[in-house]
């Protein structure tokens, strides 16, 4: 039956145990607000992650296809197969020191999360999201997961853009060249990885606060592996990863994942998604005269 259930029991989406529809948490697995204000039976039809992962993946794929079309179709080969032009990325809202500080397009810290530079880029990020996103939704709730995902992306791109703009200052430091290169942020940056690192940061915080060494250890291990991979591989924005992780950790601490998820959390999550969509539209509108040619 479609609608809100106000009495009785529902099935916890995380562990499958029966819980009261108005219980603050599942006493089997600890999930906050397992009844989802009575909408749990309806929301379960969207999957165990309540639609978060399919939504993000779908939106990212749509933006990737649009960026390919703006790039003129299939470009590159091998590891660079289906690469997207910098023109297309800028037109749809890429972030970095150039767009944010040189051009004043501050809203791109919201839109860049939904863009990817090539086929391997989006495949790797979406596989990571599939593994991490569902667990985050189960543990801290869908509303807070969306908030963390968006805010972490903003934090990551702000940090990377700021360090990208600080290149003249960083270059003056009396440090070896390889250290200086590690300190420099990005001039142009896109991708969901900053937000994904934010989810890992949130899980690390939850593990510490709840005393779950398993969640804390697994999330920290994921973060370390992905960060080291970013140091080894060229062209990866590690400062966005670091900023995203920190943003996710602090946002999780602010919203306290051990408490029941509230209606205003879902409202804030919707506002975050609307702001992200508006940021993409702002970049498109700014470049419309060029795009229409």
What are these regions (language model features)?
Residues 52-190, 233-239:
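N-terminal TM1-TM2 helical hairpin plus the immediately adjacent luminal interfacial "cap"
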Residues 146-150, 192-195, 214-221, 269:
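Cytoplasmic-side transmembrane-helix entry/capping segments in multi-pass membrane proteins
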Residues 192-200, 242-246:
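Membrane-embedded alpha-helical segments of multi-pass membrane proteins
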Residues 1-48, 230-293:
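C-terminal transmembrane module of polytopic alpha-helical membrane proteins
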